[in-house]
């Protein structure tokens, strides 16, 4: 919020706890087939909390900051994925949709976003503005997510091509990250500080 010069919007303590515990509880219940209907409701509730949080925290100025909007995107994909997983109790095809929203969109996008931020800081480089290749890597990861999610609605050759395209975009995104960041990660910090 300092970066955007906007007030920080605090979350109630119960929201912070629920966004942590509900997804874990859902996963444990689903893994052991314990009260699947209740697990579905927990998953939908968790996804709703994630999605509402994105709405509450959103400012248009976020769009100018790749290091911020990538985190919003990953958090939103995770929330939508949790909702889809919950709805799969009634519409079974939604499970595949939810798994890939969380797997590629949540884990893939958030991991790349956090690696990009933290590695800059820990190598003594400025987070803002990020290297020009970073937003490109971010967009490729988002494209990989969208294509992988859309692949759940097609079959045959279209499905195969979609999977390959998504995997290629995912890989290129991470390769761009590695290409830019590995030289920093194997050298002493740019600012000369220890670490």
For each feature predicted by the language model, list its residue ranges.
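Hydrophobic alpha-helical transmembrane segments of multi-pass integral membrane proteins
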Residues: 1-195
């Amino acid at each position: 919020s300092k970066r955007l010069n906007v007030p920080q919007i605090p979350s109630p303590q119960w929201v912070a706890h629920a966004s942590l515990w509900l997804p874990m509880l859902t996963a444990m219940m689903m893994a052991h087939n314990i009260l699947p209907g209740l697990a579905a409701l927990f998953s939908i509730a968790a996804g709703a909390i994630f999605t509402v949080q994105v709405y509450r925290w959103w400012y248009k100025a976020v769009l100018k900051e790749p290091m911020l909007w990538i985190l919003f995107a990953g958090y939103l994909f995770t929330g939508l994925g949790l909702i889809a997983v919950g709805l799969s109790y009634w519409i079974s095809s939604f499970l595949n949709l939810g798994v890939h929203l969380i797997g590629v969109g949540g884990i893939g996008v958030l991991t790349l976003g956090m690696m990009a931020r933290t590695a800059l800081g820990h190598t003594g480089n400025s987070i803002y503005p990020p290297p020009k290749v970073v937003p490109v890597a971010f967009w490729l990861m988002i494209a990989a997510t969208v294509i992988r999610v859309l692949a759940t609605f097609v079959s045959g050759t279209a499905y195969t091509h979609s999977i390959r395209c998504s995997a290629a975009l995912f890989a290129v995104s991470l390769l761009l990250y590695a290409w830019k960041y590995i030289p920093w990660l194997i050298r002493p910090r740019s600012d000369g500080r220890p670490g």
